[in-house]
UniProtKB/Swiss-Prot annotation:
Classification via InterPro entries: ATP_syn_F0_a_bact/chloroplast (IPR045082), ATP_synth_F0_asu (IPR000568), ATP_synth_F0_asu_AS (IPR023011), F0_ATP_A_sf (IPR035908)
GO MF term set: proton-transporting ATP synthase activity, rotational mechanism
Keyword Hydrolase: no
Alphabetically ordered keywords of this record: ATP synthesis, Cell inner membrane, Cell membrane, CF(0), Hydrogen ion transport, Ion transport, Membrane, Transmembrane, Transmembrane helix, Transport
GO CC annotation: plasma membrane; proton-transporting ATP synthase complex
Compartments where located: Cell inner membrane
Membrane topology term: Multi-pass membrane protein
SUPFAM superfamilies, sorted: F1F0 ATP synthase subunit A
Transmembrane segments: 17-37, 78-98, 104-124, 176-196, 200-220
Sequence similarity: Belongs to the ATPase A chain family.
Major subcellular site: membrane
Functional note: Key component of the proton channel; it plays a direct role in the translocation of protons across the membrane.
UniProt protein name: ATP synthase subunit a
Length: 227
């Protein structure tokens, strides 16, 4: 979004500064709300605790089908943090005067690299270095020289697909909102705000569930190879 539409643009006209400012801001908002929700846990939850419990229960419910109950809970701190952070990073750009950190390819690429490094680390830690990379070659040894480089390229391309999918969608949403605010009064874009909020949630969900899918492929690699 053009600098004139961001409060941070009044302080510094560097786009990197604006993205960094909003990245820190969204992280602080997410951390503050999480602290508030868990500050005094109750049997009968308050509104904020109820929202976070519903969110985490929803993540676990969907993740069970992907990776199983035990591992879904094991990786919940990572995936839950990613889901919440990505949602706030997407949604903050809907507010006039703010810009989505996820509208920057550098930011989404950083998130994708974190996921890429982590799921490969977990795969190596679970199966060992040799066994983990051996499954890239497939069950047929004769095809290993062909399949191994293809699998390596396929895994590396996940960084590109994860980062560009999120970046492209949120950048497009920001451009759409910018045009709406330039052409229509403040009240007219209200339906667009609702749609963009849903899109912010949807993109956070997709990023989160793909993280679980990649983790499942890494830590369950030996089981998949056996079928």
């Amino acid at each position: 979004m053009n600098d004139i539409f961001t409060f941070a643009g009044l302080i510094d006209h560097s786009h990197d500064f604006i993205i960094g400012f909003h990245a820190v801001l969204t992280a602080l908002i997410a951390l503050f709300l999480a602290k508030m929700a868990t500050r005094s846990l109750q049997v009968v939850p308050g509104a904020l605790q109820n929202v976070f419990e519903a969110l985490l229960d929803g993540i676990l419910m969907m993740a069970r089908d992907v990776i199983g109950e035990e591992k879904a809970r094991k990786y919940l701190p990572l995936t839950g943090t990613i889901a919440i952070l990505v949602f706030f990073s997407n949604a903050i750009g809907i507010i006039p005067g703010f810009e989505s950190p996820t509208s920057s390819l550098n930011y989404t690429l950083t998130l994708a690299l974190i996921v890429f490094v982590y799921y490969n680390f977990e795969g190596i830690r679970t199966h060992g270095f040799i066994k983990y990379f051996a499954h890239f070659a497939g069950p047929v040894k004769a095809l290993a020289p062909l399949l191994f480089p293809i699998e390596i390229i396929s895994h590396c391309s996940r960084v590109i697909s994860l980062s560009f999918r999120l970046f492209g969608n949120i950048k497009g949403d920001d451009m759409f909102l910018l045009v709406m605010l330039m052409l229509a009064p403040w009240i007219a874009p209200l339906p667009a705000f609702v749609i963009l909020t849903f899109m912010a949630f949807l993109q956070a969900f997709i990023f989160m569930i793909l993280t679980y899918v990649f983790l499942a492929g890494a830590v369950l690699a030996e089981e998949e190879a056996g079928h």
